[in-house]
Amino acid sequence: MSRAVFLDRDGVINRAVVREGKPYPPATLAEFEILPGVLDALRELDEAGFLLIVATNQPDVARGLQSRETVEAMHRRLRNELPLDDIKVCYEVESPTSLCYKPKPGMLLEAAQERNIDLSRSYMVGDRWRDIGCGRAAGCFTIFIDRGYAEELMDVPDVTCADLVQASAHILHHASLEPAKRSV
């Protein structure tokens, strides 16, 4: 089975727009800025054999605040510039019937089924409590990127890091401590 690093998008891979202490996705492709160090961090994880999968809530599309075309253009840029294996997107708003909207683990469970991923040997990296809740619900090791937002963490992450560069180093170290698993 494969190991994966699941990554939130806004605030982890690209710069989030922060207003009054709360993060928002960039509204336009011109505002979409990949954070420093992200490319190198992802290359190291890719070279170590991890699948790299973005799992992102984009409810502004359902709310009519952003077009799906703009989100897809941002994702084309990510695919062109970063060594990503997949991008899972939940375009829904939070509701009891949504299976994909984080903190529900639907996007991670779907990726695990499609790509034969061992979630217990995988990681979820995010900058909001929803990401940590999602990773925990899926059975992943969770890493919180602390951006200092004015919101409370609902779930305790396994580790807190300053950015994806630090998170990547932690993942590579943590994974090196894991006993080798033989395929049968």
What are these regions (language model features)?
Residues 1-51:
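Active-site neighborhood of HAD-like aspartate-dependent phosphohydrolases
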Residues 3, 68-86, 95-124, 128-184:
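Asp-based, Mg2+/Mn2+-dependent phosphohydrolase catalytic module
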Residues 7-9, 56, 126-127:
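Active-site flanking residues adjacent to catalytic metal/cofactor-binding acidic residues
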Residues 10, 59, 104:
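Anionic group-transfer/hydrolysis microenvironments
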Residues 14-16, 21, 63, 133, ...:
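Conserved protein kinase catalytic core
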Residues 15-17, 91, 146:
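Residue-level signal for short segments within beta-strands and strand-turn junctions
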Residues 26-29, 59-63, 95-99, 155:
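Conserved short-loop catalytic and cofactor-binding motifs
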Residues 38-71, 75, 84-96, 135:
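Substrate-recognition element of Asp-dependent hydrolases with the DxDx(T/V) motif
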